[in-house]
C-alpha cells in the first residue's frame, strides 16, 4: 500500500516532467544471478551462524535459502515464502519466541505508570554505579554521581561519553546527556533527588553507614534503593528511619545491554514505592521483575550453581573452552567461564561466598534453603587477590584483547571417531551438570515465593541471564523436556556427584 499523498506527488512530478530517469538495472541483474547468489548466500550463512546457530534459529537460514533459490523471481519467491512461513511458525523455536515476546510485554506492563520524579543521585561511581548513572542521564534524567574519590567519577564520565558515542546519533544528544550527568564528590545532589541508588561494594557495614548518612539529607518523600546483588534487604534496612521507602533495584552488567532489573521488596515496604520504582524503570527503558528479598534474589540464586559447577569441571581438568562450548551449544549466549570474566571474578567471589553462607541446609530439613552449594575454589580467591578480575582488568580465566576473550577452539569432532557416541554422552552430561542446577534453583525460588509464578521466572532468566530464548525459559524447558526426565537426570547426577544435585521439593508442585 502507498499513502495517497505520495501518489498525488508522483502524478504532479510526472506532469511537470520532474520524475528521475530510472537507473540501469544491470547491477541488480548481476546481484541476482545464480553464481552471485551462491557466493553471497554462503557469506550470509557464515555471518548469521556467528549470531544465531541454524539448529536453534532456522528462520534466517530459510530466508537465505529462499533468496538463493528464487532471487529475481518475485512471484516464485513469494509463493515459496508462504510455504516456508507455514512450516516455521509451528516449530518449537517459533512458539517459544512468541512466548518470550509476551513475557516481555508482561514485564513492560508493570512499568506503564508515570514516574513523577526527574532527579537521581547515585552513590558509588564504579562499574555498576557509573553505568547506571550514565544510562539514566541518557534517558533524560538529571543525575548526580558521588563517590569518596574523584578518580572513579572521572572514569565513569569517560565511560559515559564512550557509550553515548555508540548509541547517539546527534552531537547535541551526546552533549545534553553529558550535561545531565553531574560529578558530585560532596554528595550535594542527595538533597534534591527523587531517588537515591546506592551502588557500593557488597559489604553490609559499608552500605549501612552510607544509608545513615544519606537519610539525614534525603527528602522525606524520596526513595532509597540498593543495587545489592545478594544481601537480603532485611539486613540492609536495620537502622533505617524510613524502611518503608527502601527497596532493591538490582541492575545487571553491562547496564546498557541488560534489560532486566530485579525490583526487590521486603515485608515493610510501601506498595506505592514499588509502583514508583516500576515506573522509574519504564522511564529508562528497562524491564522490571518483582522479587522478594532472599539471598541472591532470583537471577543470582539460579546463576551461581551454574557457574560453580563449571568451576568444579574446570578443577577436574576439563578445558574452559569445552565447558563454554557445551553451554553455548545448549543455547546460552556465552559459557559460564566467559560469563564469570565478563561479570568480574571479584563479583563472582563475593556473591558465591555470600550465598554459600546463606544457603545452608537445616538440621530438620525444613529450612527454606535446602540445597548445599559447592565450596568456593581457592584459585578464584587467589585470582581476585592478584587483581586478575576478568575483562575489566584484561586477564581472568581468559586473556582479554580488544574486549574479547582469547580462546583456543575445541578440537573438531571427526565423523569416523570411534569414541564419538561416548563424547556426545559426556557433552550431554556436562550440559545437564550446568543447566539443571540452574533450573532446580528456579524451582526452589518459586517454592519459596521469591517470585510469584513461572512466567516471572522464565522472563527474568531470559532477560537477566540470556537463558536460551528459543527454549522459552528454564521452567518452560523443564516442562518441554518432561519433568520426570529432569528429575531422573538430577537423581542420577546426585548419585554420581553428590547432594548438590538432589531435586528441590518444589518439583512436586510443578508436576
Where are these regions (language model features)?
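N-terminal glycine-rich phosphate-binding loop for ADP-containing cofactors
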Residues: 1-511
Amino acid at each position: 500500500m502507498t499513502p495517497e499523498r505520495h501518489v498525488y506527488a508522483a502524478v504532479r512530478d510526472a506532469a511537470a516532467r520532474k520524475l528521475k530517469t530510472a537507473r540501469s538495472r544491470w547491477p541488480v541483474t548481476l546481484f541476482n544471478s545464480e553464481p552471485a547468489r551462491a557466493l553471497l548466500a554462503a557469506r550470509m550463512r557464515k555471518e548469521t551462524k556467528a549470531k544465531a546457530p541454524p539448529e536453534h534459529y532456522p528462520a534466517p537460514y530459510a530466508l537465505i535459502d529462499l533468496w538463493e533459490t528464487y532471487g529475481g523471481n518475485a512471484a516464485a519467491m513469494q509463493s515459496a515464502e508462504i510455504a516456508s512461513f507455514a512450516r516455521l511458525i509451528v516449530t518449537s523455536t517459533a512458539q517459544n519466541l512468541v512466548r518470550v515476546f509476551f513475557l516481555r510485554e508482561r514485564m513492560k506492563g508493570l512499568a506503564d505508570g508515570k514516574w513523577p520524579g526527574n532527579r537521581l543521585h547515585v552513590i558509588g561511581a564504579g562499574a555498576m554505579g557509573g553505568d547506571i548513572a550514565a544510562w539514566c542521564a541518557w534517558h533524560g534524567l538529571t543525575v548526580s554521581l558521588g563517590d569518596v574519590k574523584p578518580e572513579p567519577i572521572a572514569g565513569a564520565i569517560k565511560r559515559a561519553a564512550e557509550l553515548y558515542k555508540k548509541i547517539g546519533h546527534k552531537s547535541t544528544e551526546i552533549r545534553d546527556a553529558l550535561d545531565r550527568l553531574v560529578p558530585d564528590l560532596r554528595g550535594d545532589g542527595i538533597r534534591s533527588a527523587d531517588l537515591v541508588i546506592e551502588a557500593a561494594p557488597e559489604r553490609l557495614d559499608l552500605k549501612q553507614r552510607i544509608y545513615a548518612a544519606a537519610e539525614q539529607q534525603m527528602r522525606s518523600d524520596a526513595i532509597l534503593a540498593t543495587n545489592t546483588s545478594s544481601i537480603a534487604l532485611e539486613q540492609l534496612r536495620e537502622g533505617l528511619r524510613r524502611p518503608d521507602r527502601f527497596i532493591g533495584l538490582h541492575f545487571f552488567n553491562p547496564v546498557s545491554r541488560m534489560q532486566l532489573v530485579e525490583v526487590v521488596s521486603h515485608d515493610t515496604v510501601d506498595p506505592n514505592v514499588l509502583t514508583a520504582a516500576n515506573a522509574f524503570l519504564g522511564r529508562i527503558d528497562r524491564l522490571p521483575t518483582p522479587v522478594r528479598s532472599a539471598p541472591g534474589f532470583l537471577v543470582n540464586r539460579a546463576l551461581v550453581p551454574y557457574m560453580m559447577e563449571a568451576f568444579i569441571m574446570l578443577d577436574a581438568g576439563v578445558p574452559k573452552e569445552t565447558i563454554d562450548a557445551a553451554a553455548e551449544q545448549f543455547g546460552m549466549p556465552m559459557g559460564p567461564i566467559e560469563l564469570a570474566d565478563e561479570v568480574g571474578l571479584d563479583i563472582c567471589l563475593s556473591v558465591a561466598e555470600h550465598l554459600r553462607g546463606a544457603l545452608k541446609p537445616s538440621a530438620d530439613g525444613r529450612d527454606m534453603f535446602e540445597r548445599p552449594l559447592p565450596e568456593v575454589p581457592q584459585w578464584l580467591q587467589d585470582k581476585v587477590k592478584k587483581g586478575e578480575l576478568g575483562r575489566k582488568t584484561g586477564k581472568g580465566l581468559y586473556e582479554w584483547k580488544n574486549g574479547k576473550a582469547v580462546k583456543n577452539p575445541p578440537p573438531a569432532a571427526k565423523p569416523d571417531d570411534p569414541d564419538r557416541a561416548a563424547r556426545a554422552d559426556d557433552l550431554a552430561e556436562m550440559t545437564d551438570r550446568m543447566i539443571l542446577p540452574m533450573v532446580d534453583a528456579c524451582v526452589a525460588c518459586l517454592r519459596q515465593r521469591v517470585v510469584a509464578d513461572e512466567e516471572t521466572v522464565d522472563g527474568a532468566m531470559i532477560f537477566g541471564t540470556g537463558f536460551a530464548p528459543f527454549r522459552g525459559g528454564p521452567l518452560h524447558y523443564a516442562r518441554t523436556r518432561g519433568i520426570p526426565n529432569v528429575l531422573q537426570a538430577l537423581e542420577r547426577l546426585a548419585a554420581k556427584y553428590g547432594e548438590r544435585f538432589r531435586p528441590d521439593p518444589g518439583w512436586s508442585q510443578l508436576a
